[in-house]
């Protein structure tokens, strides 16, 4: 499931976005990715996780101290990923799920003509890498759109522990269900919406996801290019630019380079769901 996160089924995604995965990493770096590793001992990681501002998003509610300690025992290190670097590649063996602590990623696949087809955008507090569960290999590339930091946990250990900790098992099921909902949302978006509806849905979804993490829901800094947005939405660059210009002319948004100020949220909602 490389396609993640369009306005859907929109409220469901927003609610589910508050659940995520945690601050764990015992994965060894892939040399070909040139990803910088932040070596940390067990006690240091425990402190880092306890103080992490993603803890409420990542950890299942209701775990006992003993259960938390068992999760802590799987921790090894965190990873820093520089802008433009790849976290995992299409075809690479699947071993981990990744929680994004900071930064922004895109997932993409190479189309037949050699261009990258963007299949999703992921931000801090969200999970990346679930595409590999199906056949034990990743089906897309994950590329950092800005300097980022991630935590990883071996999926085999997640499965083992979730069989013993009911709250963790429920959390796993909830995350997988969310990805199915998101996949359906993208299919709906690309199959039936006009250009204006697609871009409006994209902006609303991005605003909702940021707001659920304590950021402004009207002031957006787009980490992706317009070309990448167009690739994700199935629209040409010229169409994206024209649609943004139309939104500006109608007083719906103000745009300055990658900064987007949503002036009229209701107007965007009316575009997606006309009365």
Predicted features and spans:
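Polybasic "coupling" helices that flank or enter modular domains
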Residues: 163-236
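Cyclic-nucleotide recognition modules
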Residues: 118-181, 185
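Short phosphate-coordinating micro-motif centered on Lys-Gly-acidic
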Residues: 86-92
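Short hydrophobic targeting helices and cationic amphipathic motifs
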Residues: 8, 12-15, 28
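Cyclic nucleotide-binding regulatory module and flanking cytosolic helices
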Residues: 34-83, 127-128, 132-133
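Phosphate-/nucleic-acid-contacting segments
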Residues: 23, 29-34, 208-275
